[in-house]
Amino acid sequence: EDPVGTDGLVTVRAIIPKGEIHADNLDALAEIAEKYGNQNLYTDNRQNLSIHGVEPKNIEKVKNAIHELGFRTEGFFGIRDIVSCVGTTHCPKAVSGTRNLFDALLKITQESKYDLIQKQGFINITGCPNSCSPYRIADIGFRGMRIRAEEEGAVEGYEMLIGGNEEAHGKKVGDFKSEDIPNIVRDLLDLFLAENLNKETIREFIDRKGLDYVKSKLLYEEIK
């Protein structure tokens, strides 16, 4: 649902994939905010933008205008609202191309079968130990790394944690090649979809079932 303020006016949000927006689209969103909102754009901790002060009668007009720019207005604060740092695209400290993993995981989470669980967890991706996208406190978190493989030598990979939040860091599932992670995430989401109870979060599911049980249900090859 769209947040409603004490004044009865509504906040309409736009999901900004990877937190990156072209200057022309930013200008266009600013024009929408000037016409229908309080003339400001606001950022949030999931790298998205929102327009405050929209009259209820204008909600659909604002959303349609945002959709025409290619941005979604649904799916906030869930598994489809993935956060990633810039990775090797810009950062000299990054060791993994977080953008590619973002695209692969977003494609999976947008499958219709996950509609029922899309509000029950967060996914964060960071390209190095600095954790600019805090992977340790996400339901599903990834930290970029270089890992040794028998034939390829050092390859791009990620440490994967599950079950984290602001109270406790996630538990380590393992270190994996980048190419293997999408299938691992799909297996995890399928398991959660089948066995979660009473709309529990992914973290609550991990706590209830235990890390060993969850790992036993995932098909993967960890890099030792």
Regions found by a protein language model. Give the residues of each.
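Accessory RNA-recognition modules of RNA-modification enzymes
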Residues: 1-11, 16-19, 52-53, 131, ...
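Long hydrophobic segments that form regular secondary structure
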Residues: 1-10, 17-40, 181-185, 189-199, ...
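Mobile "lid/hinge" segments at catalytic clefts and subdomain interfaces of large enzymes
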Residues: 6, 136-198
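Small-residue-enriched alpha-helical segments and adjacent helix-cap loops
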Residues: 13-152
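Acidic/polar loop patches that form or flank catalytic/metal-binding clefts of enzymes
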Residues: 118, 197-202
